[in-house]
Amino acid sequence: MKDLLNLLKNQGQVEEFDAIRIGLASPEMIRSWSFGEVKKPETINYRTFKPERDGLFCAKIFGPVKDYECLCGKYKRLKHRGVICEKCGVEVALAKVRRERMAHIELASPVAHIWFLKSLPSRIGLLMDMTLRDIERVLYFESYVVIDPGMTTLEKGQLLNDEQYFEALEEFGDDFDARMGAEAVRELLHAIDLEHEIGRLREEIPQTNSETKIKKLSKRLKLMEAFQGSGNLPEWMVLTVLPVLPPDLRPLVPLDGGRFATSDLNDLYRRVINRNNRLKRLLDLSAPDIIVRNEKRMLQEAVDALLDNGRRGRAITGSNKRPLKSLADMIKGKQGRFRQNLLGKRVDYSGRSVITVGPTLRLHQCGLPKKMALELFKPFIFGKLEMRGLATTIKAAKKMVERELPEVWDVLAEVIREHPVLLNRAPTLHRLGIQAFEPVLIEGKAIQLHPLVCAAYNADFDGDQMAVHVPLTLEAQLEARALMMSTNNILSPANGEPIIVPSQDVVLGLYYMTREAINAKGEGRVFADLQEVDRVFRAGEAALHAKIKVRINETVNDRDGNSVNNTRIVDTTVGRALLFQVVPKGLSFDVVNLPMKKKAISKLINQCYRVVGLKETVIFADQLMYTGFAYSTISGVSIGVNDFVIPDEKARIIGAATDEVKEIESQYASGLVTQGEKYNKVIDLWSKANDEVSKAMMANLSKEKVIDRHGDEVEQESFNSMYMMADSGARGSAAQIRQLAGMRGLMAKPDGSIIETPITANFREGLSVLQYFISTHGARKGLADTALKTANSGYLTRRLVDVAQDLVVTEIDCGTEHGLLMTPHIEGGDVVEPLGERVLGRVIARDVFKPGTEDVIVPAGTLVDEKWVEFIELNSIDEVIVRSPISCETRYGICAKCYGRDLARGHQVNIGEAVGVIAAQSIGEPGTQLTMRTFHIGGAASRTSAADSVQVKNGGTVRLHNLKHVERVDGNLVAVSRSGELAIADDFGRERERYKLPYGAVISVKEGDKVDAGAIVAKWDPHTHPIVTEMKGTVTYVGMEEGITIKRQTDELTGMTNIEVLDAKDRPAAGKDIRPAVKMVDDNGKDLLLPGTDVIAQYFLPANALVGVADGAKIAIGDVIARIPQETSKTRDITGGLPRVADLFEARRPKEASILAEVSGTIAFGKETKGKRRLVITPNDGSDPYEELIPKWRHLNVFEGEQVNRGEVISDGPSDPHDILRLLGVSALAKYIVNEIQDVYRLQGVKINDKHIETILRQMLRKVEISESGDSSFIKGDQMELTHVLVENERLNAEDKFVSKFTRVLLGITKASLSTESFISAASFQETTRVLTEAAVTGKRDYLRGLKENVVVGRLIPAGTGLAYHSERKRRRDADKPLRVSASEVEAALTEALNSSGN
């Protein structure tokens, strides 16, 4: 009976827990874990292979080596369980207790724990307020530290070297206590009175003025409060007892040949035990101090190496000269405990094989080789065979399966029916890398994959392998079928567009069947219905491309969603009529009445999904594929060398270019142009020539002449095989055809610069040796790039997933009214992304009014779908405030309204959706497509001439946005602000284009004017920066003395004289401090004031300014007083591609970032200091002026006396996101980062929805910095979680106390991941040691809210179906609280019941 009870006891349910706390272990605690002390360094006996007693593998301490058998063999078998053998002292138990039981080593002298000593910032150092260097000198026995000064002049914590110590001894005798080593440190830590220290620090902080000191004090204060709050004692950072890991976690395995393979930990432990025992002996013998000291130091080093080898000094190496793997190395890195065993586990019931095409499969099927299926579904087959009575035992069933009897195959077919399997292709970059399919048994050994899912897997059939996994439990099968089935994943989660889109052969076939040809057989016939067309085509009476008329019946949905039948006669071709047969009801014939290129097919599937739903779309996609394959086979499209038609104009174009290049070469030789100009001109020339050749070639390829049925010669689109492939989007592009039939063009060197001599040949003509050599140069770089890119992109994805992993949709609506203002994304005047596309799938945050009225046309809280988008565009709305993940106020997670539509499903997102991970995958997955290189704006890569005017593309009405301007005498406006924009709106009031207007631009239209397309509405000189007057008057020169501050220059060509202001460093001593200016006076010579201010109207002239007005001249409003020549923009590398995305997400400050105005006010320049200008902004509200020093070489956009607004650009350069956040707020930052990241992806043609980037941004903006602590417990300058601060402020508000004030902080993704609330998540990401050290000292609790923490502790994740499980568990536990019974009570009750039943 007792055995039964014990069994029950052992089977006890794992304790349910809500949080995991990490802390420091006290010596008592370490002893309480221990099952005995390890006293000897021996491991096992080399003859008997039995563990030595009291050694590192001792069976008495750790438990038996064999199940239920003591070491000497006296007690064997289960009946003796729990007996302790009197001979060998081993308890009879399961051998697996050797994985759980720990031991300890009593250290003869205390030892500092290296993590708390060396992991920066040193915790021991902070607490004791000593530098790490000093503490190390004490610990490693180089100097003494005063512990108790007694009545002497020494101070507590003072360091003494040997000499000073002996002097002090002579002077004071035994009045003071100074020691060295870890015991001294332990004494000092023990003596710290936390409460007293905390009080002292809290008083001290407000009284100090120096920033650095405040920082240091608040760091100490934080640490002390952490110790006080967590119940850890400071002296526990010094070890007096060392725990020993269970032996089966550091195994010793005999190899053949009498050698052993051992874990490095055993060596490290042996070293510690040896030194510890030697030290004990020396202390017993009371050996000389110097020997003991040396031994103590060696013990300290041995323990250091065991805990974290290599952290201090040289790493201890084993016999093979490799550093030994210490405890810290066991848990960190890719091979460490976290990433290898806790986050990534191996999967049972899986197989892998090569994939081949399965063109006959349905979308939800995959072909599974019989051999594989038999192995994967073995347990199910055994069960079925037994159930059927075909086999009596499992053993018999096994035999049947091994012999592969015919009934086994029948049973297999039955088992497999409707049992989905998961197919996965590595690398799994997004969630579509694992999908579920129903298996179909096939012969052969390769898995068959449906061609349409290849895009999602990024798979091709050149030898790719895929893995198959079997979902075993009913729940797993259910989830696989309902959520992961390939038919449920038609849309891409990244952008909401179909990802099940035909490509290659299928596209070619569909394109071929929907093309029209002139004068094909059967042209002009009229058919009664589609069936008739089909019959005539099969009979060979009409060609596939013939133009015909057909009467069709279509069912279309009208605006209200009701289906309407429609009969009409349409002009079409035979192929299109045939294709319409597979189109589902509800779509109009117009969707197929055009040549089906790849984009058109994608649109068709998208429309099908939105109009007729999922099921029809899946059937339709399959039908499209079958049709496409059939007709691409019939088409017989193939390429021969004669398809590459070389244009006749090629030779002429190349000849002309060569002549021009010769001309430039001769100019260079005679010194008329510089090397750089020559290079740029030549490259420009060749790129132009290349474009001309390719234009001629495409014109040649794309058209062919045919005879129509009237006998005339007409042109039609070509049926050239290569042209059809490129035009349909099946394979190849114009650029590739250009290399085959045009000219290869300019080649790049590995550093991105372009080689001057182009390759004039194409692949049809063949390359010469030199040409081939030139082209290999850049091609190798491409391959090397790809390898690097994959690794970098993977690392970016990992950081993104880590920062966003705990973001899950946790509620329907957080009730916020905030959001982001959405406007169309306009670049260089073009609308790149219309408003409709940007708000699709978002929830409107505030009512949208009809322009110019008070009528609400879109109420707040509307989820914008395709119909609403049409409606918004019809009503010409050009800005909408939408809910956004950034402004969501849900505390943990995010609400469904702020996220909007689940892109992969097309409806509002469900609670439990792991939107953070989806966002990270959507951004990271296309990472490999981005380029690695930084673009040189040089050569032909991407050179644009500087813009000098605005020419409108569409006619419409002019709108001017935040433009300050003055009106000139001739009626034109002159811009006097920097951020002005000019927009053109159409008749509906929709903005079609938008242009930036620089300072000094002359605008020839006014607000509300009508302009025609092509009109030039503004002009400026791109190479100079004007200074414009805002009033009329007479010019007076101030401080402009020739030869001292200015020099006169006469232009040789025009004979005009200019006055140029000299740079301060070129002036004679007399002119160094004079600041030349132009002052405006009225006719009586009185100073004029700037309009609306009491500032004298004088314009200070910067160095090199050219003054164009004479002293005493009369000028009018808007005239230019002076021009500052602008250096032509230096060719700086623009970081593009992947590195740019990484920089933005890491929130790195760019080099030479643009300088923004910190406050709104008036600009003035103060006294210059060495090499810097002093910029002073006087705020308009009369507060203190703001000063900033700016290096002289920075080009400033502002002049003395000018008004700027907070956040306006003062000096150009790349923007610093931190500045944008600080000065312009969260929404400006969101707009900037979203646009910048989208620009990189758009360049590669990748579509990602904005909300994914916003989701990551939300995680980067989690933290705030406390600027005033109010009555809260926060310290000024602390970084806290935003939600934490808001909750605390709510509490303070309720108690009528002062709340804390804070500013938002932007963290890069790596930093944000490391500073999450969960230490498990942070530790498993990077810098494991540092994270765990900090968490242990502060006694952190991890509430397991994210996904990663739950995976690590082995639970379901709180997302998707797991979220329901977690909330249900919580609900049950809350209901059960009072009913909790302790285990001992249950045991007592059971025992009593059993005893009373008479045993």
Curated annotation (Swiss-Prot):
Metal-binding keyword on record: yes
Cofactor(s) it depends on: Mg(2+); Zn(2+)
Reactions that this protein is recorded to catalyse: RNA(n) + a ribonucleoside 5'-triphosphate = RNA(n+1) + diphosphate
Cofactor note: Binds 1 Mg(2+) ion per subunit.
SUPFAM superfamilies: beta and beta-prime subunits of DNA dependent RNA-polymerase
UniProt xrefs under CDD domains: RNAP_beta'_C (cd02655), RNAP_beta'_N (cd01609)
Protein name, per record: DNA-directed RNA polymerase subunit beta'
Residues reported to bind Zn(2+) 2: C814, C888, C895, C898
The keyword Transcription appears for this protein: yes
Oligomer status and interactors: The RNAP catalytic core consists of 2 alpha, 1 beta, 1 beta' and 1 omega subunit. When a sigma factor is associated with the core the holoenzyme is formed, which can initiate transcription.
Example of a GO cellular component annotation carried by this entry: DNA-directed RNA polymerase complex
Matches recorded under InterPro entries: DNA-dir_RpoC_beta_prime (IPR045867), DNA-dir_RpoC_beta_prime_bact (IPR012754), RNA_pol_asu (IPR000722), RNA_pol_N (IPR006592), RNA_pol_Rpb1_1 (IPR007080), RNA_pol_Rpb1_3 (IPR007066), RNA_pol_Rpb1_3_sf (IPR042102), RNA_pol_Rpb1_4 (IPR007083)
EC supergroup of this enzyme: transferase
Family under the similarity heading: Belongs to the RNA polymerase beta' chain family.
EC number per UniProt: 2.7.7.6
Molecular-function annotations in GO: DNA binding; DNA-directed RNA polymerase activity; magnesium ion binding; zinc ion binding
Positions that bind Zn(2+) 1: C70, C72, C85, C88
GO BP terms in the entry: DNA-templated transcription
Alphabetical UniProt keywords: DNA-directed RNA polymerase, Magnesium, Metal-binding, Nucleotidyltransferase, Transcription, Transferase, Zinc
Residues holding Mg(2+): D460, D462, D464
SMART domains the record matches: RPOLA_N
Function: DNA-dependent RNA polymerase catalyzes the transcription of DNA into RNA using the four ribonucleoside triphosphates as substrates.
A Pfam family it matches: RNA_pol_Rpb1_5
Listed NCBIfam families: rpoC_TIGR
